[in-house]
């Protein structure tokens, strides 16, 4: 062995290529162990170890062979098949006498061995079965592990991809941050430079401002000096003129006296009586005395112009209006010169030369003194006392401060010749200047503010100072100051009831409470003296005004709102009655009437303003006559500034203050005879009750001196005083077209203030309808500017010029557009006005409408068509056809064309701006959008500064302009054809428009691809989100997959019009050119569907998540036998059909032929029919036949209509074990039988419309794979929400409305109705009545019409929900009491208790699940309540159902039910359940006639028992609850009714207390409805519900309170008022006895339940 091993060593060590050489060398060399190296020794050792191991192996092999030979030799003749021989051999071998036998009995040993082998075999088989099951589990786990590994790999790959993307994004962000930081540094540097420049400019500006202010001060001082000198010159000039006038008047008097003397001489010569000749000198003497006293006889008019110029309203024409002042000295009066001076205004604001300076009409103050014809000497004594009784001449005027201004006063003259004096037009101040404007004459303003301070006001040091009096000759002038002020205070106090200050004008601080002279604005410094004045004091010059209107446009401070002007110099010694007080007037020269004006501070603007607050003009009669209410009964508003005047801010007019009262002026431009002394008999006086002393004032046809306002006719028209206006119009000779200086006629004033009745009166009186004012504005212009559309309509009807243009070119249409008066615009357009008239600045009405941002006006101008035959559009047409442009394509404007031309839209004004320029620059996006809808708009037109619309636009308008030429192509999602319709897919829409893509000229194909993908992703996330989130909120979520599993990968194809396209594909043309060339009107995205073996389109159509659909398909492919079950309407049929289609196309793609076989199961579907179906479809084949390769898909629908176990019992085993080894024998019709089996290529799917299986059907459960579609679990739970949300998004064209939108609220309500209904039905234990979401998929979504949804809900309630609930409750209530045939009888003839339960359940479901949470207002909801059957059940729930904004559990108001408490009584009230109203309660049975017979029979029984108290106990059998299930239903209803109004009723804890019952002779308990309610307080949580075991009875409230047990009226517990639990109520007893009797404690606190039919409840007797 060692030699062999040594010889083998070289073979192991040498290489194959030199094996021969190595052997030769080994043979030559001598083997020497000592010469071996270390590696060779190791090799030798390993070889020797191998030899030893080989020797051991040989030894073992030899031993084994020896053992086998030994056994064969000894036991070879025996066979293991016969162990008995072996045992016999051993027995015989040891059968010697000495040796003991090996076994006593071989047979028993063999039997024991066999028993042991059986046990072992059983154990091994059990272990084998366990091993097989473990192997199966292992294989399943391996498959799951592989799937998880694949998913893990995918996620890892996606993670790496996302990391790569994120790295790129981070790098880009870092780069961009660096760029931005550099730009920030540059911008900061630029900002510093700009700020430095700004500081330099500010310094320069400050220096210039200082120089300018110094220059202003110097100019003001110089102007003040000039004014002082001019005042002195004016005064001297006027004194000389007055002196000349007095001399002329004196000469005239002398001539008159000479003529009279000549007449007297002639009379004496004729020998006439001496008495007349003696009386005439006396009259003359008296008159002369009066002349000396007054000095105002013989009216001679002179012109005095104002001294200070003012910037007028229109600079192109300026009028010089003289100031007229009467001057007439008395003959031979020593004070003639003084009187001449006293007749002149000493104020610079009142008189100035009218030669070299231009005076505005607003700067003039008119003074006129008409003559009053006396009737007797006593009349003269009233106004001027005789010589003997004349007080000091200087008493007629108080001592005035140098800045004070008493009113000019004149006493009427005597001679009638003075009535021929010409009328003074200077009294007619324009209406616009009737108020005190901020920009009035500074000299008048200075005088006014100087005059506002009281003479007795304390100065700065607190000392009471008085201004020095005027320098008069009389020494008693100071003493008469008190009398003068007392007279003024008296007039003010007497008129306080008519002229109280406005609400917004508090009295000036420091003013005396009596309202003396200091509280009134001054007229001007007009120190007009009477005959007793020696010389005229010029007074101090007015203070230097802070800013002249000619130098600055800053308005002066506003004047006080209350101004009273008292024009008086002396008054008679009579009392003036005012404010129910008689106040004595001191002796003063008060004229016949005092004018008190309550003025408003009228704003000025460049356009017509709304009328100001009303002002009151009153005339006070000093002779004790009361002022009639006619003058103040219909007081309107004074007109504001003239309409349409585009004045600068500095062009306000000055104050007009007339200082004269017209008594009986004969200055009448129309007819001098209209003011005769007998005018007091006129119609006006007769109607108003005025005294004759006031009649001449109102009846004078001359200018009415009412604070410079127009005539009385104009005042009545402006104030809307129809009564006064009609009386004035009845006067003869009245000029109704008379215009004030601004040209304002009475018609103009009435139209401007919107007094339609006055306009109608004036037009009927043939007033000039087109009379224009000085600025060219007609009454139609004024009415259109102010928005008085009724006046506009009336003026148009009287042929007013609708195209009249004012001086500035403003037409009525322009003014209406400028002020946004759309009704006036419509009337003018329908009258045919010209839209294209332009102003002098080149502005059109479109410019005006756009300038104010008035969208409605612009729509009218562009789209309102003129009627063909003058017929105005109806209101509905105009509303729908004009103002719905914002609705987009659905509005009429989206389809109709504008009526204006492109040239008109593109017209540019003087600066070159079009209407689009104005809208874009002001940010009026809506106006710009309307303009852009006109096809002819030129957005590239440039103004005179070479700017386009885009250049001047704001950011929003720029975005609009950029998208102007963009193509808006709707993007639609299509799911292909949904077929057939009977699979519950009627409500599925094949196409949904998700948004509109804006395709611009510069849009690239990459941008277009991204836009399409982003739009789809946003849409999928919008419809699958949990709330109403906007697209902006969802774009923050970067996940590409939505909750339902759809993404851009779900797209099968995209078509641009009719051209197919895929994401990322590019064409030669740009998207914009491509769409135009191919006339692509829409982009359609087709989702992958069952035809491609995918379920994306099914997911989108049904809103079932894609993963769940894929899981269902996997179950069908893996298990072959799958049944889908759930409540009716859970889309089982649709799901099964779509899965079958997808499976079919998948198998066909794999190369197999496939067929779908559908069978509808009904009650008559037999097992034989099912067998024939299986055999005919080659799903069940004979054992002898080879298996087919064709795939068969069997669909069995409506399996709930048949007994599942009876139908499928014989097919269960072969369906589970599909092979020839487990066949099943079926008998044919001819008596022959044959073995069949199901092959592996057969798939069986079924649908059951049941929530759960019952009875024998449970035996089938283990043989199928079941998919349960629960209403409270996915996919059904969120399906309806996603479906309705997609409906809403489709209605809003891809936009998600906000949660507060009514559409969102009504959709949320429909969703909550479905959930609450199923929750309530689950709690009632009626799963067969549960509803799937299919019935609610047809919920209409109509924006703005929530009533449509409520009506749809009522139809669903009446047609679907009510019959199902009724059937379910009846079946449950009668299932235990009656079995078999009697159960059907019970359904046909429900008992009284069953009817009660059904009615109560319907009513509770309606109020708690349906109407609860409806967003309609309560009043509107009550109108729809009658549409719901079963809602008339007397729950009397008083609550607001509009609680959708509350969270769950927060709305407890709906349970607040009101009933009066009831007391126990001995009489029993009969139940009203015997007379149910089936038509209103919605109980639908097949045998209504039988039910009606029973109802009538029970009613007759009830009537016969009504008066018999003893027999009422027998009613309990008819009215008792028939079964425990019926009682359980009652408990559930009671618990639901007493719950806290949680929307999810399943969350409400059980709160049931004992329902008390009373025994009646061992009979069944009477089920009561009303529990005695004692007036006790209630807590919200302690509610005493009604249980089925014990009832508490209550009597009718009509019966008297007696001892004993009370009866009940109705059946179901419904709380009517909340009371606390009774103290004796314990927890529910475990006893099930129905006859336990419990006393009612009078102190118990219990609920009052009422379910009787009548709505009202009778009050209890007290």
Curated annotation (Swiss-Prot):
ANK repeats lie at residues 708-738, 742-771, 775-804, 808-837, 841-870, 911-941. GO terms for cellular component: actin cytoskeleton; cell cortex; dendritic spine; FAR/SIN/STRIPAK complex. Keywords: ANK repeat, Cell projection, Coiled coil, Cytoplasm, Methylation, Phosphoprotein, Repeat, Synapse. Residues 385-395, 1623-1637 have a biased composition (Low complexity). The modification Asymmetric dimethylarginine is found at residue 497. The modification Phosphoserine is found at residue 1523. Residues 118-275 form a coiled coil. GO terms for molecular function: protein phosphatase 2A binding. Residues 404-421, 516-529, 582-592 have a biased composition (Polar residues). Residues 1-23, 202-235, 365-439, 453-477, 498-615, 871-897, 1446-1473, 1614-1662 are annotated as: Disordered. Residues 1644-1662 have a biased composition (Basic and acidic residues). Regulates the dendritic spine distribution of CTTN/cortactin in hippocampal neurons, and thus controls dendritic spinogenesis and dendritic spine maintenance. Associates with the striatin-interacting phosphatase and kinase (STRIPAK) core complex to regulate dendritic spine distribution of the STRIPAK complex in hippocampal neurons. This is Cortactin-binding protein 2.
């Amino acid at each position: 062995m060692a030699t062999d091993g040594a010889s083998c060593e070289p073979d192991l060590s040498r290489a194959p290529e030199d094996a021969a050489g190595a052997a030769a060398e080994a043979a030559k060399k001598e083997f020497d162990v000592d010469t071996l190296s270390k590696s060779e020794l190791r090799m030798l050792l390993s070889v020797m170890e191998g030899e030893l191991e080989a020797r051991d192996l040989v030894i073992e092999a030899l031993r084994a062979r020896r053992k086998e030979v030994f056994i064969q030799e000894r036991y070879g003749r025996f066979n293991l098949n016969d162990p008995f021989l072996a045992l016999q051999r051993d027995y015989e071998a040891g059968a010697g006498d000495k040796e003991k036998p090996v076994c006593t009995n071989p047979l028993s040993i063999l039997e024991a061995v066999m028993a042991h082998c059986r046990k072992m075999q059983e154990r091994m088989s059990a272990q084998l079965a366990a091993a097989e099951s473990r192997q199966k589990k292992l294989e399943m786990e391996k498959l799951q592990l592989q799937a998880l590994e694949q998913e893990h790999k995918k996620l890892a790959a996606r993670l790496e991809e996302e990391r790569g993307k994120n790295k790129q994004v981070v790098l880009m962000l870092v780069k961009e941050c660096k760029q931005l930081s550099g730009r920030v540094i540059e911008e900061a540097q630029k900002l510093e430079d700009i700020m430095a420049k700004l500081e330099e400019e500010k310094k320069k500006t400050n220096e210039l401002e200082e120089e300018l202010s110094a220059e202003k001060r110097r100019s003001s001082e110089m102007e003040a000096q000039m004014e002082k000198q001019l005042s002195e010159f004016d005064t001297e000039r006027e004194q000389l003129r007055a002196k000349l006038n007095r001399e002329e008047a004196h000469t005239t008097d002398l001539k008159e006296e000479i003529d009279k003397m000549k007449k007297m001489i002639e009379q004496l010569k004729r020998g006439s009586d001496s008495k007349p000749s003696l009386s005439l000198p006396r009259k003359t003497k008296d008159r002369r005395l009066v002349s000396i006293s007054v000095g105002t006889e013989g009216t001679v008019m002179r012109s005095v112009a104002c001294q200070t110029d003012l910037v007028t309203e229109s600079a192109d024409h300026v009028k010089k209006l003289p100031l007229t002042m009467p001057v007439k000295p008395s003959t031979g009066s020593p004070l003639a010169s003084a009187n001449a001076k006293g007749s002149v205004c000493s104020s610079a604001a009142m008189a100035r030369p009218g030669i070299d300076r231009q005076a505005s009409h607003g700067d003039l103050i008119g003074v006129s003194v008409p003559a009053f014809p006396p009737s007797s000497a006593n009349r003269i004594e009233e106004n001027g006392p005789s010589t003997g009784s004349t007080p000091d001449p200087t008493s007629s005027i108080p001592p005035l401060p140098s800045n004070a201004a008493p009113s000019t006063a004149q006493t009427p003259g005597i001679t009638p010749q003075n009535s021929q004096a010409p009328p003074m037009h200077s009294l007619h101040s324009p209406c616009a200047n009737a108020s005190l404007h901020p920009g009035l004459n500074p000299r008048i303003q200075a005088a006014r503010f100087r005059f506002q301070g009281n003479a007795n006001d304390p100065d700065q040091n607190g000392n009471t100072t008085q201004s020095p009096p005027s320098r008069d000759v009389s020494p008693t002038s100071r003493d008469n100051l008190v009398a003068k002020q007392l007279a003024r205070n008296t007039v003010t106090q007497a008129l306080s009831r008519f002229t109280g200050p406005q609400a917004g004008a508090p009295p000036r601080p420091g003013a005396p409470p009596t309202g003396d002279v200091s509280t009134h604005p001054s007229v001007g410094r007009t120190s007009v003296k009477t005959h007793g004045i020696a010389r005229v004091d010029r007074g101090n010059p007015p203070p230097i005004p802070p800013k002249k209107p000619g130098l600055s446009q800053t308005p002066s401070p506003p004047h006080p709102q209350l101004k009273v002007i008292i024009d008086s110099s002396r008054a008679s010694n009579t009392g003036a009655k005012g404010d129910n007080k008689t106040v004595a007037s001191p002796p003063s020269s008060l004229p016949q009437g005092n004018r008190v004006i309550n003025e408003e501070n009228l704003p000025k603007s460049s356009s017509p303003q709304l009328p100001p607050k009303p002002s009151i003009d009153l005339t006070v009669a000093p002779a004790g006559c009361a002022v009639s209410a006619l003058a103040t009964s219909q007081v309107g508003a004074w007109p504001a500034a003239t309409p349409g005047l585009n004045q600068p801010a500095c062009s306000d007019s000055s104050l007009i203050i007339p200082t004269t009262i017209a008594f009986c002026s004969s200055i009448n431009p129309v007819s001098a005879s209209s003011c005769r002394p007998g005018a007091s008999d006129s119609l006006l006086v007769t109607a108003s009750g005025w005294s004759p002393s006031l009649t001449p004032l109102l009846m004078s046809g001359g200018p009415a001196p009412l604070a410079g306002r127009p005539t009385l006719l104009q005042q009545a028209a402006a104030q809307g005083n129809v009564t006064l206006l009609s009386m004035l119009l009845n006067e003869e000779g009245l000029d109704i077209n008379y215009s004030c200086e601004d040209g304002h006629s009475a018609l103009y004033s009435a139209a401007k203030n919107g007094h339609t009745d006055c306009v109608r009166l004036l037009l009927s009186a043939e007033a000039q309808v087109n009379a224009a004012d000085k600025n060219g504005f007609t009454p139609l212009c004024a009415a259109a500017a102010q928005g008085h559309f009724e006046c506009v309509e009336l003026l148009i009807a009287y042929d007013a010029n609708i195209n009249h243009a004012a001086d500035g070119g403003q037409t009525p249409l322009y003014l209406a557009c400028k002020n946004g008066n759309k009704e006036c615009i419509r009337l003018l357009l329908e009258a045919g006005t010209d839209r294209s008239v332009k102003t002098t600045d080149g502005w059109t009405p479109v410019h005006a409408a756009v300038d104010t941002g008035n969208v409605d006006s612009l729509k009218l101008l562009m789209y309102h068509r003129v009627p063909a035959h003058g017929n105005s559009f109806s209101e509905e047409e105009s509303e729908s056809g004009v103002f719905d442009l914002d609705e987009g394509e659905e509005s009429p404007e989206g389809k109709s064309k504008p009526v204006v031309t492109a040239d008109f839209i593109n017209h540019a004004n003087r600066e070159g701006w079009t209407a689009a320029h104005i809208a874009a620059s002001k940010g009026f996006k809506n106006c710009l959008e309307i303009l852009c809808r006109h096809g002819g708009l030129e957005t590239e037109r440039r103004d005179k500064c070479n700017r386009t619309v885009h250049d001047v636009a704001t950011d929003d308008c720029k975005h609009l302009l950029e998208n102007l030429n963009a193509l808006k192509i709707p993007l639609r999602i299509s799911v292909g054809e949904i077929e057939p319709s009977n699979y519950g897919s009627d409500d599925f829409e094949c196409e949904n428009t998700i948004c509109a893509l804006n395709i611009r000229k510069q849009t690239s194909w990459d941008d277009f691809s991204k836009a399409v993908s982003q739009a789809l992703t946003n849409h999928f996330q919008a419809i699958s989100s949990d709330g109403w989130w906007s697209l902006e909120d969802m774009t923050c979520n970067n996940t590409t997959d939505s909750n339902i599993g759809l993404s851009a990968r779900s797209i099968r194809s995209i078509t641009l019009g009719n051209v197919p396209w895929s994401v990322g594909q590019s064409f030669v043309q740009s998207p914009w050119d491509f769409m135009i060339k191919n006339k692509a009107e829409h982009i359609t995205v087709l989702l992958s569907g069952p035809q491609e073996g995918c379920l994306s389109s099914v997911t989108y159509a049904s809103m079932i998540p894609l993963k769940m659909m894929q899981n269902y398909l996997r179950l069908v492919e893996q298990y072959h036998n799958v049944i889908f079950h759930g409540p009716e309407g859970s889309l089982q049929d649709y799901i099964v059909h779509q899965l079958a289609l997808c499976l079919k196309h998948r198998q066909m793609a794999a190369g197999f032929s496939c067929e779908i076989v559908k069978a509808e199961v009904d009650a008559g579907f037999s097992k034989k029919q099912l067998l024939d179906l299986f055999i005919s479809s080659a799903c069940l084949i004979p054992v002898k036949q080879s298996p087919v390769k064709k795939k068969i898909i069997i669909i069995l629908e409506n399996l709930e209509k048949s007994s599942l176990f009876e139908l499928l019992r014989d097919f269960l085993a072969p369906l589970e074990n599909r092979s020839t080894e487990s066949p099943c024998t079926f008998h044919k019709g001819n008596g022959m039988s044959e073995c069949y089996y199901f092959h592996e290529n057969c798939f069986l799917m079924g649908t059951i419309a049941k929530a759960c299986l019952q009875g024998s059907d449970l035996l089938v459960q283990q043989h199928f794979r079941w998919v349960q579609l629960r209403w409270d679990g996915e996919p059904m739970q969120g399906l309806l929400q996603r479906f309705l949300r997609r409906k809403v998004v489709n209605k809003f064209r891809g936009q998600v409305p906000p949660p507060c939108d009514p559409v969102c609220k009504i959709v949320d309500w429909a969703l909550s109705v479905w959930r609450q209904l199923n929750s309530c039905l689950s709690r009632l234990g009626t799963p067969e009545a549960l509803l799937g979401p299919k019935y609610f998929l047809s919920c209409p979504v109509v924006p703005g019409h929530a009533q449509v949804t409520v009506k749809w809900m009522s139809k669903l309630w009446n047609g679907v929900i009510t019959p199902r609930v009724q059937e379910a409750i009846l079946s449950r209530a009668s299932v235990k009491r009656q079995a078999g045939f009697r159960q059907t009888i019970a359904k046909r003839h429900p008992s009284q208790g069953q009817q009660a339960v059904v009615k109560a359940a319907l009513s509770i479901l309606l109020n708690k699940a349906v109407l609860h949470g409806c967003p309609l207002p309560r009043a509107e909801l009550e109108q729809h309540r009658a549409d719901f059957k079963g809602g008339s059940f007397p729950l009397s729930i008083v609550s607001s159902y509009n609680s959708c904004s509350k969270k769950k559990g927060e709305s407890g108001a709906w349970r607040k039910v009101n009933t009066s408490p009831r007391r126990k009584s001995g009489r029993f009230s009969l139940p009203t359940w015997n007379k149910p109203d089936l038509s209103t309660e919605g109980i639908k049975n097949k045998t209504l006639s039988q039910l009606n017979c029973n109802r009538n029979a029970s009613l007759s029984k009830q009537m016969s028992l009504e008066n018999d108290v003893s027999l009422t106990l027998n009613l309990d059998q008819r009215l008792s609850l028939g079964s425990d299930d019926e009682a359980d239903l009652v408990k559930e209803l009671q618990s639901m009714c007493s719950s806290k109004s949680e929307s999810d009723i399943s969350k409400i804890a059980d709160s049931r207390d004992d329902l008390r019952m009373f025994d009646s002779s061992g009979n069944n308990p009477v089920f009561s409805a009303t529990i005695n309610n004692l007036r006790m307080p209630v807590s919200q949580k302690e509610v005493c519900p009604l249980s089925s075991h014990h009832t508490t009875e209550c009597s009718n409230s009509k019966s008297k309170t007696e001892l004993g047990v009370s009866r009940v009226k109705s059946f179901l517990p419904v709380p009517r008022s909340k009371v606390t639990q009774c103290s004796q109520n314990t927890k529910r007893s475990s006893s099930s006895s129905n006859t336990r009797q419990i006393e009612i404690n009078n102190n118990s606190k219990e609920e009052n339940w009422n379910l009787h039919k009548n709505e009202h409840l009778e009050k209890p007797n007290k």
